Regions:
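Non-catalytic propeptide/linker segments at domain boundaries
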Residues: 1-9
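N-terminal extracellular ligand-recognition/capping segment immediately after the signal peptide
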Residues: 13-27, 32-59, 66-77
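Extracellular beta-strand solenoid repeats
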Residues: 39-41, 47, 60-62, 73, ...
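Extracellular beta-strand-rich solenoid/capping regions of secreted or surface-exposed proteins
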Residues: 45-60, 71-122
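Short glycine/acidic-rich loop motifs that flank beta-strands on beta-rich extracellular proteins
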Residues: 48-51, 75-77, 97-105, 136-144, ...
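Right-handed parallel beta-helix
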Residues: 85-96, 117-137, 149-167, 172-199, ...
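Predominantly extracellular beta-rich ligand-binding scaffolds that present long acidic/polar faces
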Residues: 196, 207-321
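C-terminal accessory segments
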Residues: 308-350
Length: 350
């Protein structure tokens, strides 16, 4: 497949500790206005021995090979990747198992981006694309309790194996946790996220309850889950918590072709819609979702009353091959027929 890549700014030699590298090679001021792409070598092994804070500089850490990822291992218990602006991780295998801090944490904001509603507004995306992340003991993304409004947070074509730990506070918050602010658009697509830790998050996504599109100068917000597989997250909690979105005409939702198993206390779509009926919003798209919890379904006759009302919820077991060990290959006929969940688990017969 042909893929276009932004020009390389620097190639970082394999075997490098990225903490040392960025101490010795500070991101230049060019990064204030231009995305700078740092390439890790295909198949190369890298470490990060302490947190790296990119602040207000736009950085992509990536492997240019989509088939031979560089491997990045966090090597201390308090390592986070920090940013306060547009940022991306692409085509990386990340081992976060030694760190008990959030994988991505937002920096002290640059005062110059303070805007409508006193939000620190980042006009661009925080992106995780094409990554395989293991050993996430704490939040995947945390806003550092700063009043950020990111235009978008995008997770695509990524596997994130959470090992949520009782040594952190994650049981009281979320996998994607904006304590001070919110993401105006959250899009999770073509991805698999699951938890096998000794703890669990209370929510998959949580924003500060004041967060709302119009309060930060946007016309509408979006929460989009598209072709994803989710397993064993917020099992006794709630999938989503963002009081400022609830029942607002400016809140848009798109939830299509996902498989949720043992998530969100059998109320996934209800919580995505903030406990308000689909009819209370201008834009709610739902189709071909599976909501299975302890072998039962949220839906009856293809409908979750008031919430997923298109009429085509799937009520067959997706038949994961070995969920406990991270193999979510599906065997469920309805899921195969409608090509649902993360596409990587739809295996065609040889």
């Amino acid at each position: 497949a042909f893929s276009t890549f932004t020009a390389t700014y620097q190639v970082i030699p394999e075997g490098t500790d990225l903490a040392t590298y960025f101490e010795e090679n500070a991101v230049p001021d060019e990064g204030l206005t231009t995305m700078l792409c740092y390439d890790l070598q295909p198949g190369g092994e890298y470490t990060m021995s302490k947190s790296v804070d990119f602040g207000n500089k736009q950085v992509t850490l990536r492997t240019t090979s989509i088939s031979n990822h560089a491997k990045l291992k966090l090597t201390a218990d308090n390592v986070s990747i920090k940013t306060g602006t547009i940022f991306a991780l692409k085509n990386l295998d990340i081992d976060a198992s030694q760190s008990f801090d959030p994988l991505i944490s937002l920096s002290t904001p640059d005062e110059s981006i303070k805007g409508t509603g006193d939000y620190y507004i980042v006009r661009g995306a925080l992106t995780i694309n094409g990554c395989n992340i293991t050993g996430v003991n704490n939040n995947l993304i945390y806003d550092g309790n700063k009043k950020y409004c990111y235009e978008s947070v995008v997770i695509n074509n990524t596997m994130a194996h959470l090992t949520l730990s009782s040594q952190t506070n994650v049981s009281g918050n979320a996998v994607i946790y904006f304590k001070g602010g919110f993401a105006n658009t959250l899009q999770v697509s073509n991805s698999t996220i699951w938890n096998t830790g000794d703890s669990d998050s209370k929510y998959f996504v949580q924003y500060n309850n004041s967060g709302r599109a119009t309060r930060a100068g946007y016309n509408n917000s979006n929460v989009n889950f598209l072709n994803c597989t989710f397993y064993n997250i917020a099992k006794t909690g709630q999938w989503a918590n963002y009081g400022g979105f609830n029942g607002q005409k400016c809140s848009y939702f798109d939830v299509e072709r996902n498989i949720f198993v043992d998530c969100g206390n059998k109320q996934v779509i209800r919580r995505i819609l903030g406990g308000r009926s689909a009819s209370s919003y201008d834009v709610v798209k739902t189709q071909f979702n599976t909501y299975m919890f302890d072998g039962e379904f949220e839906s009856t006759g293809g409908i979750v009353e008031n919430y997923d009302v298109t009429g085509n919820c799937l009520e067959t077991d997706p038949g994961f091959k070995d969920a406990k060990n991270g193999d979510f290959t599906i065997s469920g006929s309805a899921q195969l027929e409608n090509k649902t969940g993360d596409p990587r688990w739809i295996k065609t017969a040889e």
